[in-house]
Structures are given as C-alpha cells and as structure tokens.
Amino acid sequence: MKNLKKIIRIALENDWIKKDPFAYYRFKLEETDPEFLTMDEIKIILAKEFTIKRVEQVRDIFVFCIFTGLAFSDVKDLSPEHLVKDNKGELWIRKNRQKTKIMCNIPVLPVAASILDKYKDVVECTGKLLPVLCNQRMNSYLKEIADVCGIHKNLSTHTARHSYATSICLANGVSMENVAKMLGHADTSVTKHYARVLDQNIFKDMQKVNSCLSELAI
C-alpha cells in the first residue's frame, strides 16, 4: 500500500495523472500477529548440534538476532565501531537502524557475547563482526534448521526480532518503553502490539491449565 501511494504521488507531481484516484478512499490494514519463538523453542535451537559449518553459522546468527533484536540488515552491517563499553564495563551495541535511522541501544546479553567471541577471528568477518550470508540463503538454511529442530514455524530474521521483543524482553518484565528503545522504534505503538500477542499466548496457556484443573473443587 505504501508503494502504491508513492507511485500515485510521483505520478501527480509529474502530471502523468490529473487527480489522486484514491483521494476519497480510506484503507484500513488488517493487523497480523507477529510470529515468535517460545523460550522452550529457543532452547531447542541453542542445544542443537550441526555437523555442517554453514548451517551452524546461520543458527548462530539467528540466535544472535534473537538475543539482540537486530534486523537482518543491521546484523549484516554490524562492525567493531558499534560495540561500546559503558563506565561499568558492560558491553552495548549502539547503532542507527538501517531502515529508520533511529539509534538503538542494546545491552549485549551473555549468549550474544559468546557468539561475538566465537567469530572474532574468522576470516569471513573482515571488517564485520559476524559472517552473515545474503537474506535469501539465510532463510533457506533457517527452513532446514526448523525441520531438524522439529519447530513448525516459519523461521526468519523477522521471527528472531519478534522473539527478542516477546520471549526475551516483555516476558521477563522489561518495560515497553525500554523494548522500544532497544528495537529502535520511534514510539511504543509497535511494542504494544507485541505485548498484546504475548497476552493472547499467556491466556491460551492458562486455558489449558484451567481445563486440567476444572474438576478440582473445595
């Protein structure tokens, strides 16, 4: 829809059309729930051993995205200059998002730090922190990883980012405001959507508990 509006605007500016054909229409986009991994699914991927080096690397990059919330373009662009230590010696990722140019400030959790350490001397990482493939190849390997791990979800770097927001942050009590800052969101409107999805999943789980306990009474 955004691309269509852009084309209409360019056509109007160049007098290719006389008026906006959609001027009196208001489109309401239907919200879709972002897919994310549960903590149990994340642990399965972490524990899985891969014999093929390239698949292992893709798993590591995917896990790094889960524990930092970085989008594909940002993790591919990640270089030593984006790593900063604060006055307490804690490691942070500080960089502008490729998509929005908004600064994101992300504390480097132990899992992410161990992945950075694992690839610090890898030749493929010259000038960059991690050996990131092109998006198409990475998503192809992620399908293979999902199959091997028995996870029936469409794994992508988007899934990793959603998992960071929900399972890593919001589920562990991180405020929406802080999640928004770490993800590089302009405000909390998108973050609130993650929180709503998380609430829905909690409710579904509690319904299962309720059905198991339904026969109990005092």
What residues fall within each predicted segment?
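Basic, Lys/Arg- and aromatic-enriched nucleic-acid-binding interface segment
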Residues: 13-72
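Conserved tyrosine-mediated DNA breakage-rejoining catalytic core shared by Y-recombinases
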Residues: 26-35, 41, 77-115
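C-terminal catalytic core of Y-nucleophile DNA break-rejoin enzymes
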Residues: 31, 98-117, 123-144
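Catalytic-site neighborhood detector that most strongly recognizes the C-terminal catalytic loop/helix
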Residues: 36, 97-101, 113, 135, ...
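Short basic/aromatic active-site micro-motif
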Residues: 57-58, 132-136, 152-172
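C-terminal catalytic core of tyrosine-transesterase DNA break-rejoin enzymes
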Residues: 63, 67, 73-74, 144, ...
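Short, polar N-cap/turn motifs at the start of nucleic acid-interacting alpha helices
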Residues: 82-89, 152-153, 173-193, 200, ...
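C-terminal secondary-structure termini that scaffold catalytic or DNA-interacting sites
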Residues: 122, 209-218
